[in-house]
Amino acid sequence: MRLNPDCVRDILLSVEEICDYHNVFDYYENNTEFNLANYSHEEIIYHIKQCELSGLIMNVRYYDGATHICIGDLAPSGHQFLANIRKATVWNGVKYIAEKVGSTSLSVLTQIAANVVTELIKAQFGLTP
């Protein structure tokens, strides 16, 4: 399965919205409560696993053959990545650059997002040539 960057972003946004000290993100196969209705169950499972392996989410537990997945929270790197890509215009720019470069891996997307934000900060302060 190919990585869908939009699915990753939607998972991270959903986890951030739900998780706190009292609540975990509980995903069930037939649950349409979150902003994940555009993705198949297989896509969601795959992308949750990719987020876990990339260190973006933590305390992930799989139950009943992955028909129920519990996510404890975003990891610090997940918070940072999401903060960098929250704004839709930034996210669209990150995806555009990734397509031009020819790589949409999570590590590349994370690096591009950080660089885009750095360039926006420089532009804000008039530091770009």
Question: Would you name each region that the model predicts?
Answer:
Residues 2-34:
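Short amphipathic alpha-helical interface segments
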Residues 89-129:
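Membrane-inserting effector segments that mediate pore formation, membrane fusion
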Residues 60-61:
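Beta-hairpin "wing" of winged helix-turn-helix
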Residues 15-18, 51, 82-85:
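Generic structural signal for hydrophobic core residues of well-folded globular domains
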